Amino acid sequence: MTVKNETVDYSKTLYLPQTNFPMRAGLPQKELELMERWEKRGLYAQLRQQAKDRPLYTLHDGPPYANGHIHIGHALNKVLKDVIIRSFQMRGFNANYVPGWDCHGLPIEWKIEEKYRAQGKNKDDVPLNEFRQECRQFAQHWITVQSEEFKRLGVVGDFNRPYTTMAFHAEARIASELMKFALSDQIYRGSKPVMWSVVERTALAEAEIEYHDHESDVIWVKFPVLQADSKDLYDAYVVIWTTTPWTIPANRAVSYSSQISYSIYEVKSAENDFGPQVGEKLLFADALVMSCAEKAKLVLKRLRVISAKEFKTLVLSHPLKGLAGGYNNKIAMLDGSHVTESAGTGFVHTAPSHGREDFEIWNAYKPLLEQSGIDSSIPFPVDDAGFYTKDAPGFGPDRKGGAIRVIDDNGKMGDANKEVINALIKADRLFARGRLKHSYPHSWRSKKPIIFRNTPQWFISMDKDLGDGSTLRSRALKAISMTRFVPSSGQNRLASMIADRPDWVLSRQRAWGVPICIFANEDGVILKDERVNERILRAFEAEGADAWFAEGARERFLGERAHESWIQVVDILDVWFDSGASHSFVLEDRDDLNWPADVYFEGSDQHRGWFQSSLLESCGTRACSPYKAVITHGFTLDENGKKMSKSLGNTVVPQEIIKTFGADIFRLWVMTTDYWEDQRLGKQILQTNVDSYRKLRNAIRWMLGTLAHDEGEEISYCALPDLEKLILHRLSELDQLVNRAYDDFDFKKIMRALLDFSITELSAFYFDIRKDSLYCDPPSSKKRKASLQVVREIFERMVIWLAPMLPFTMEEAWLERYPESTSVHLEQFRPVPMEWQNESLAERWKKIRQVRKVVTGALELERADKRIGSSLEAAPIVFISNPVLREALENLDMAEICITSALTITQGVPPSDAFILSDVEGVGVYPRKALGTKCARSWRYTQDVGSDPTYPDVSARDAAALRELQVLGKI
């Protein structure tokens, strides 16, 4: 029987973990305390001072609009950028983050107009610069709000000196960049069909468009043949199909494809109230004739094939010919590559006033059309407010009752479709009609449908020779080929957009923004006068772009040329030009940033937005890209993969996540996503991240508690036990992985590796094995000191590696360990000694862990069957027939590795009742209860408990530890 020592409380003789680092993080409150500490200690200024002599690393911030609280997309974007900035700052670079805001444009202007409408005010009654001042104040308010929201996410940056596109200097530089385009003849005035918002009375860029389902009228229309080489075509009709009946008055041609098979068909029977009658001859693509016949309830007979050659000489009449004395123009047949057999009739209604492809094919054939005596001019059938003009006879101001409207001020469809359809029925030119639900472009701000309309605008040419044999398009495509893209698919995506895009529509008919500050004559010729430009730029620098709209601005800027017939352009610049020019007034103007930027990082929608406008602006003025790399992230969906929407009630608000869980939980979610794809977020997903966070935090907490007993002793590498060398080898591997992944912006790879390492290799393996030695060994134990040294290395390296990702938690942990330190964020990633890399040792331990896995499996079964409580109650026999595994275990205390009180290794084939695992050949375990007595201090079962009479209830090892502690006065 073991005698119990009643005089010693053994729990107080153990080196148990001691720390004030709580298990429950309380992040929402703790993060605020850390932010206050950073602010008081001037952490941002210290980061800049520390890095002032290092090489620069520049991430240029794509500016969000200053018009509301941040949403989940903003939060995702800023966290990803913050991780990049912090990771380069901690790896030897001067990485300064300068946040920016896009302040001009329709979103902000729309908000002020909404306020006016609520007050019963009319925007047109307010002086322009007074309105602009309200827009400026609105933007400044939201810059302040968003700054605090970004900082609450843990984002570190120069929030006291951000860039804004409405700053006077920025407006001056934007104007200067515009002048460079003007002076190099890249800007011209022209008329083209542009996307037009009737509700907002302005042209829109592709990036300002979103697509929603919309139900439209669809019609099939008969165009009578006017001229043909073949007599049997003279009384025939070419049938087109369109989803925009209101554009029929603007028709100038019908397009076909020489690659499609067409025939002439005769109507044999008809069951309809209007449309084709028996005996009529109609032209269709053969692949589409059946669907067309069914729609019009016809039985058709194929007469013959129509050759592509016949179409070249075919001329049609307008289906509304004679209406209100108009539409007497000849309708040409044009061979177009955009014509397909996917829907319709195989013939495409072509209205160059209302479609990009229509416009392009019309211009391509312009010389031939004029040779044929066809008027090639393009009409303006619809005005700014969506009303028909005089170019649409019978529907415009000549109509009794006034002009008909296509879309009204509320974005509702007007009577245009109905009136055009009625006119076609009256003219016996309607083949069939219907309704179609399809994806249709809407303004991203008003959410209302837009139209394509021909309107005079200012453009930047994509294909003008720039004097060196290049064009803006070719320069941009070359720059793309020299740019790194993450993911790599972004390169082809941006290149295809640049290759296919039309000229850049610069002008907007709005009030809030940088004006197109040029003077031009009636023919659109731009004044090129350096003195005039200099006066404009000086005024903008001192007063902002409001100077352009001040009374007497024309005379002020033209000076001695004011008597000449130059017209002041009052259109506003496309806001994408503003942000696209930001590289000029941010990267080029600040000493702490580089031009070109190392990286631009935004959502994948910015291939058609900021990435593109920045590229074109820079290539047009500097012949190269303003960035070396482009990274994109996807969009955040709900847990079911649906787009977040207020109407669906499935939005996740970043402020609520922070309030409930803390910013580091949100950041952890970001770090565990494939951010370059669309991600999912919701309560269950967040809870999964909370669970992962707790495991990581507990590992850090255990290390902090253990290191409370660390006296900083260093043991040479060669004197370390093999297990410690293995962990150092793993740290060397992780160091390579972490650095490479930070370079590759693969944050998920880092987080997954470090989570797996902390849970699988540390908590469940290394820490578990070494707890006995760390808690129970004598103070002089080299094994214990070696383990403390390695735990110290693990802690410092892991906390520093994770600091860019989880800045609050890692700061809290670092300050718990080093309370006199200023911040973990002032630390640098540490180099790894070459001697830590030990592949042969790692290979040996793979084999050791295979055997351990079988032992652990056997003990888990024993525990489940309640034959043992703790693994220390076991002393299993391990049978090993595999000589390679047996060799790996030589000179190794497997009982310590398997956390048993004893363990016997036997050579030979395992008995039939031994525990085995199918994936570990040649190993079997026979469970056996440990012999001896349970040590009251370590709880191990040994034969030497009671060998020391002073401590009769502990093992010899523990008795020696107690005597040593007694000598040191610790008990």
Swiss-Prot record:
One GO term (biological process): isoleucyl-tRNA aminoacylation
Cysteine pairs bridged by disulfides in the record: none
Single GO term (MF): aminoacyl-tRNA deacylase activity
Positions occupied by motif 'KMSKS' region: 643-647
Name of the top EC class for this enzyme: ligase
InterPro entries: aa-tRNA-synth_I_CS, aa-tRNA-synth_Ia, Anticodon_Ile_BEm, Ile-tRNA-ligase, Ile-tRNA-ligase_type1, Ile-tRNA_ligase, M/V/L/I-tRNA-synth_anticd-bd, Rossmann-like_a/b/a_fold
Catalytic activity of the protein: tRNA(Ile) + L-isoleucine + ATP = L-isoleucyl-tRNA(Ile) + AMP + diphosphate
SUPFAM superfamilies: Anticodon-binding domain of a subclass of class I aminoacyl-tRNA synthetases, Nucleotidylyl transferase, ValRS/IleRS/LeuRS editing domain
One Pfam family hit: Anticodon_1
tRNA processing in keyword set: no
Residue ranges annotated as motif 'HIGH' region: 64-74
Binding site for ATP: 646
Keyword ATP-binding: yes
Summary of subunit composition and partner proteins: Monomer.
Domain remark in the UniProt entry: IleRS has two distinct active sites: one for aminoacylation and one for editing. The misactivated valine is translocated from the active site to the editing site, which sterically excludes the correctly activated isoleucine. The single editing site contains two valyl binding pockets, one specific for each substrate (Val-AMP or Val-tRNA(Ile)).
NCBIfam families reported in the protein's UniProt record: ileS
PANTHER family per the UniProt record, alphabetical: ISOLEUCINE--TRNA LIGASE, MITOCHONDRIAL, SOLEUCYL-TRNA SYNTHETASE
The protein's name in its UniProt record: Isoleucine--tRNA ligase
Species per Swiss-Prot/TrEMBL record: Bartonella henselae (strain ATCC 49882 / DSM 28221 / CCUG 30454 / Houston 1) (Rochalimaea henselae)
Gene behind this protein: ileS
